[in-house]
Amino acid sequence: MKAGIHPKTQKTTITCGCGATYEVLSTKENIRVEICANCHPFYTGSRGATRVEAGSRIDRFRKKYGR
């Protein structure tokens, strides 16, 4: 690699909105994210309101068409 053309990497702290912090190497000093693997519904297994809405739609369909 050529000397002097690559950005300087440093230890960086990534901070999530849920309070989780991660240390990685990056060219930026601090990084803030809204959602991470610690609080994302896909990784935590919680579906929240989306599942309730889908259930009520299915119930309305069954009530309307008698199935």
From Swiss-Prot:
The keyword Zinc applies. It comes from Symbiobacterium thermophilum (strain DSM 24528 / JCM 14929 / IAM 14863 / T). One of its GO terms (molecular function) is metal ion binding. GO terms for cellular component: ribonucleoprotein complex; ribosome. SUPFAM superfamilies: L28p-like. Coiled coil: none annotated. This is Large ribosomal subunit protein bL31. Zn(2+) binds at C16, C18, C36, C39. Binds the 23S rRNA. Belongs to the bacterial ribosomal protein bL31 family. Type A subfamily. It comes from the Bacteria. Gene3D superfamilies: Ribosomal protein L31. Keywords: Metal-binding, Ribonucleoprotein, Ribosomal protein, RNA-binding, rRNA-binding, Zinc. Part of the 50S ribosomal subunit. Binds 1 zinc ion per subunit. Its cofactor is Zn(2+). Transmembrane segments: none annotated. GO terms for biological process: translation.
